[in-house]
Curated annotation (Swiss-Prot):
InterPro entries: TBP (IPR000814), TBP_dom_sf (IPR012295), TBP_eukaryotic (IPR033710). This is TATA-box-binding protein. Sequence repeats lie at residues 175-251, 265-342. General transcription factor that functions at the core of the DNA-binding multiprotein factor TFIID. Binding of TFIID to the TATA box is the initial transcriptional step of the pre-initiation complex (PIC), playing a role in the activation of eukaryotic genes transcribed by RNA polymerase II. Keywords: DNA-binding, Nucleus, Repeat, Transcription. One of its GO terms (biological process) is DNA-templated transcription initiation. It comes from Drosophila virilis (Fruit fly).
């Protein structure tokens, strides 16, 4: 102790006497003497990148065992840690099993003198490293390729498209006829109308009203002497209103003080083909309270639906006629209900 405190005491040079630090440095230099055994993904590209620059800074110097980055070199004295590309470090987080496996490999390499594991000598691809990684959805960038990989890793459930309740979306009833009534609010001379109006027929011995027709929209009107008029033959609600106004305008031009009041739709007729034959005998036995089938009088089955209040004519080929509706939606609702019933009585060809 007195010799150390004396002014003549000098610290021996590092290069003169071998110390345990020099021995560990020699062993570390022997481990790093074969750099070709460690696989670096950036070594395939001759151009310097950010990954290769970081790896070059982390490699120890051959003379003094100190790294070029911070000059400490403490982490390289106890073994070489396999390098992973920065893209994988940022995008994935090692699982607990993978960390435990890496710790065992490091312990084995330190016990056996720092030999490189065989797995590090093989080229690693992102697909091979994917098995030990867990995706970090919060930190990972929204990449299309990574999202596809995540979908394959998670449990996949088949998605079934939504289907309508009863009717096929391709089978929709079409309106064939709309019957509407209107009040002209004046007494009419039917003989004068038949003589001066075009396309008008009047035969009081056979039929009391005047029958008048127009081409656009293609409809027929029944004009009574009381001032009431019935318009039939339109394919839609707007066409029925337009046709009734045209008939009222013709009456006004003939000198009558006709008005246009109380237009009401009295009946809608729809037609639809279910595209399969129907067993009418089985249907009338099962739904005897709502149906009537007399093939000697009428070849089709008459089905009277309570709600909505619609009458359906069901012939055997499957072309359904719906009548008695006041609104278009009643036609659609009635067909949805009858279609689910008709599927049970489909005739096997």
């Amino acid at each position: 102790m007195d010799d150390i405190m004396s002014p003549n005491f000098s610290i021996p040079s590092i290069g003169h006497a071998p110390t345990p630090i020099h021995h560990s440095l020699d062993a570390d230099q022997q481990i790093e003497a074969l750099p070709h055994q460690v696989y670096h993904p950036a070594a395939l590209d001759p151009t310097p990148t950010a990954t290769t620059t970081v790896q070059q800074q982390q490699q120890p110097d051959g003379n003094n065992g100190v790294s070029a980055a911070d000059g400490s070199g403490g982490s390289n004295l106890f073994g070489h840690e396999p390098s992973i590309p920065l893209a994988h470090k940022q995008s994935y987080q090692p699982s607990a099993s993978y960390q435990q496996q890496q710790q065992q490999q490091q312990n084995q390499s330190s016990n056996t003198g720092g030999t490189t594991p065989q797995s590090l000598m093989q080229p690693q691809t992102p697909q091979s490293m994917m098995s030990h990684m867990m995706p970090m959805t919060s930190a990972a960038p929204p990449d299309a390729s990574l999202s596809n990989i995540h979908q394959t890793m998670g449990p996949s459930t088949p998605m079934t498209p939504a289907t309508p309740g009863s009717a096929d979306p391709g089978i929709v009833p079409q309106l064939q006829n709309i019957v509407s009534t209107v009040n002209l609010c004046c007494k009419l001379d039917l003989k004068k109308i038949a003589l001066h109006a075009r396309n008008a027929e009047y035969n009081p011995k056979r039929f009391a009203p005047v029958i008048m027709r127009i081409r656009e929209p293609r409809t027929t009107a029944l004009i009574f002497s009381s001032g009431k008029m019935v318009c039939t033959g339109a394919k839609g609600e707007d066409d029925s209103r337009l046709a009734a106004r045209k008939y009222a305008r013709i009456i006004q031009k003939l000198g009558f003080r006709a008005k246009f009041l109380d237009l009401k739709i009295q009946n809608m007729v729809g037609l639809c083909d279910v595209k399969f034959p129907i067993r009418l005998e089985g249907l009338v036995l099962t739904h005897c309270n709502f149906s009537r089938y007399e093939p000697e009088l009428f070849p089709g089955l008459i089905y009277r639906m309570v709600r909505p209040r619609i009458v359906l004519l069901l012939p055997a080929p499957g072309k359904v006629v719906l009548t008695g509706a006041k609104v278009r939606q009643e036609i659609y609702d009635a067909f949805d209900k009858i279609f689910s019933i008709l599927k049970k009585f489909k005739k096997q060809s």
